[in-house]
Amino acid sequence: LLYRRLKASNLDEMAFAGGSHGRMCACACPARVRSKTDACPQRAAAALVCGCIGVCSVWFCTDSRKDSNSTITESITMTTLEQQALEYHAAGQRGKIAIQVTKPVTSQADLSLAYSPGVAVPCVEINKDPAKAYEYTAKGNLVGVITNGTAVLGLGDIGALAGKPVMEGKAVLFKKFAGIDAFDIEIDETDPDKLVDIIAALHPTFGGINLEDIKAPECFAVERRLRDRLSIPVFHDDQHGTAIVVGAGFLNALQLTGRDISLVKVVCSGAGAAALACLDMLVDLGVRRENVYVCDSKGVLTTERDLTEEKRAWAQNTSAKTLSEVIGMADVFLGLSGPGLLKQEDVRKMAAQPIVFALANPEPELRPELVLEVAPDAIVATGRSDYPNQINNALCFPYLFRAALDSAATTINQAMKRACVVALAAMARSDDQFGKSYIVPTLLDKRLLTGVTPQIAAAAFESGVARKQLDDKLYTAQLEALAKTLL
């Protein structure tokens, strides 16, 4: 919600629940609050950290619904929401991150080691062997969260500086979920060639780079060129983070409905960076490309249309023009587009036990209750924290980078991403809650760090991109110790 420009006209889109749900705490916990003075039992300082968490510690009234596919009317003013967010970010030390000194600096002797003259010694060693930077500096546990502010989620092209709170929020998640230090870097540059050069010039500082909120199609080339150019992991989370969590939920949904992955028909609404990365992942997992139909704002991607290189890879030789024309007997709907683009009539056309991933945020392509109204046997996932099966990038990116840094991986490759998919899916299946309303772990599942990271690190070594092989038992024990210091 905090990612969206706060306009009165958007109030309906921002509702969390309605009808019989009654009054609900906007942090999306199960509690129902009776009045504005009631306290939310799950309200926490982390609530306003980062929009990808999908929560907000502001009270909403959700008493009324306008029509069958509309959202809800709330009794909250935008002033209250804005004030809560601004107060959170301005309270105490400004912003959300700070630097912590890790060595004692209590004496003149300490100072002589921390800075001149002692600091020259590690400089000389690193000059002889650049790999020593991982031993003598913070590089090995430091990620750059880098944006140019051209596609800040829900806000669009707001520029580098205005995107800084989001990047700080991402840094918070790296630290709180995986113990990774992160610096946010906002670059005021929209030319892809110059952006690549700037990031490449900055890369000696970091052990890995997380690209964030760079608009398509430029984001594809920026990531590809940096991956080719640099010897540290470069990861565009908007693409691949979404794809990994979608992949995990997808595998479990197939298992619950008894489907053969090679036979499923997938219809996708959306052809942006996240959507196409998700489709690449599904094909990597076993979906047949010829069984995938993709729609953008102009309709079905067909061989007759003039398409970008990325979209052309998904073009079908068909006369169908609209989503409604291709969704008949589809097993899976994948939505990364906008609210209202999936209709109940479309769901009725799908195969029995349809799998509906309506991931547009904050308002999905079709609300879960409306999907279930016409298909009670459906499995539904959204990007929202107030519904079951939340597809959230934070389930993977902290652990991917933790594994990549610890194994000294030169890149985050497909084998590592696939290992993360499989580990997340297995973690959900191992839980007693596993079922149609629990196909992926929740964000605060304390098993994530130890249950996902070792498998990713092992995949990095087995696929030849890790410079360090980690002992599985010892590494798991180290992660368990780290986990106790985090959330």
Region roles according to the model:
Residues 49-77:
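Short, Lys/Arg-enriched N-terminal segments with co-localized hydrophobic residues
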Residues 237-238, 257-259, 358-470:
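Adenosine-phosphate binding glycine-rich loop
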Residues 78-234, 459, 463-467, 486-487:
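N-terminal ligand-binding/catalytic initiation module
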Residues 188, 235-244, 267-271, 385-387, ...:
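Active-site nucleophile and cofactor-binding loops and adjacent substrate-binding regions
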Residues 153-155, 219, 242-247, 269-280, ...:
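Short glycine/serine/threonine-rich phosphate/pyrophosphate-binding segments
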Residues 161-172, 244-330, 334:
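Glycine-rich phosphate/diphosphate-binding loop of Rossmann-like nucleotide-binding domains
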Residues 312-379, 384-386:
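Rossmann-like adenosine-cofactor binding region
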Residues 26-28:
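Residue-level detector of structural "landmarks"
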